Amino acid sequence: MKTLLLTLVVVTIVCLDLGYTMQCKTCSFYTCPNSETCPDGKNICVKRSWTAVAGDGLKREIRRECAATCPPSKLGLTVFCCTTDNCNH
């Protein structure tokens, strides 16, 4: 009886997990109040930041999005990847 109960619990957890979809912030602003459901296969939240020339000075740019893989950081580009809902705030 205990084995049957344990099996049912495990199956329930696995089935519930299959329907999970990631929620990430997806915008190009410093403040990002809304989140979106990521499409299938994109279960990583990414936040990229860099400095760009704007007018007579420098401007900090930020982009948040869903991704299938974590892109590499490069010189001048900071990348933060995470795997929980809205973790790329």
UniProtKB/Swiss-Prot annotation:
Q: What are the entry keywords?
A: Cell adhesion impairing toxin, Disulfide bond, G-protein coupled acetylcholine receptor impairing toxin, G-protein coupled receptor impairing toxin, Hemostasis impairing toxin, Neurotoxin, Platelet aggregation inhibiting toxin, Secreted, Signal, Toxin
Instruction: Note the CDD domains from the entry.
Output: TFP_snake_toxin (cd00206)
Q: Which residues form a coiled coil?
A: none
The keyword Disulfide bond belongs to this UniProt entry's keyword annotation? yes
Q: What is its main location?
A: secreted
User: Where in the cell does this protein reside?
Assistant: Secreted
Cysteines engaged in disulfide bonds, as pairs: C24-C45, C27-C32, C38-C66, C70-C81, C82-C87
Q: Where is the signal peptide?
A: 1-21
Whether Coiled coil counts among this entry's keywords is: no
Supply one GO CC term from the record: extracellular region
Q: Name one GO molecular function term.
A: toxin activity
Write out the tissue specificity statement of the associated record.
Expressed by the venom gland.
Function according to Swiss-Prot or TrEMBL: Exhibits M2 muscarinic acetylcholine receptor (CHRM2)-blocking activity, but has a weak binding activity toward nicotinic AChR. Moreover, it inhibits collagen-induced platelet aggregation.
As for family, the record states: Belongs to the three-finger toxin family. Ancestral subfamily. Orphan group V sub-subfamily.
Instruction: Please give the name of this protein.
Output: Long neurotoxin homolog TA-bm16
- Give the source species: Bungarus multicinctus (Many-banded krait)
